[in-house]
Regions:
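Basic helix-turn-helix/winged-helix DNA-binding cores
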Residues: 1-90
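Structural signal for well-ordered, non-membrane alpha-helices
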Residues: 48, 75, 122-129
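Amphipathic alpha-helical dimerization/coiled-coil segments
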Residues: 79-125
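Short amphipathic alpha-helical segments at helix-loop
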Residues: 3, 25-28, 102-113, 138
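Acidic interhelical loop/turn segments
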Residues: 129-138
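A generic alpha-helix structural signal
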Residues: 22, 44, 114-115, 129
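Flexible interhelical turns and helix-capping residues at alpha-helix boundaries
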Residues: 14-15, 33, 103, 107, ...
Length: 138
């Protein structure tokens, strides 16, 4: 998966300016993919060069805002990408290494951190359930 596919998905949901897309990204796709605002803008430029996206005309001629929308080539790219196989993500989890170390050293020192992670995962689960309910209401 690439940032371009994340952005195509977001733009299919709603045509957006770069800043609006970056803000929405932080609240939704950011749970699954990390990107800086600079990376988002650079990727939008590349996607526009590939004719995957275009900009809508702004009615205010003094505005420099660009509202991006997905073009047919972008939809085709996203559809092609959706059916491709992908390898499982490489798991790199510091907490799991701490558990292995604790098994050797003892002390039961990792339990508070495990409990904190459990709380954080439950909070994320609530967010994911809200997104699911909104996106798959039917």
């Amino acid at each position: 998966m690439s940032l371009a596919h994340v952005l195509l998905t977001s733009l299919i949901e709603k045509p957006s300016t770069g800043i609006d897309l970056a803000r929405r990204f932080d609240r939704s796709m950011g749970f699954f993919w990390n990107a800086t605002h600079q990376q988002i803008y650079r990727e939008l430029s590349g996607m526009q060069q590939k004719n995957w996206i275009s900009t809508l005309e702004e009615h205010d001629s003094t505005s420099r805002k660009k509202t991006y929308q997905v073009e047919q080539l972008g939809r085709t790219e996203l559809a092609d990408w959706m059916v491709k196989q992908s390898p499982p993500a490489q798991l790199r989890e510091e907490l799991m290494v701490r558990l292995r170390a604790e098994a050797q050293l003892g002390g039961n020192t990792v339990l508070p951190e495990l409990e904190r992670h459990l709380i954080l995962h439950k909070e994320n689960l609530k967010i994911y359930q809200t997104i699911f309910a909104k996106d798959f209401a039917n």
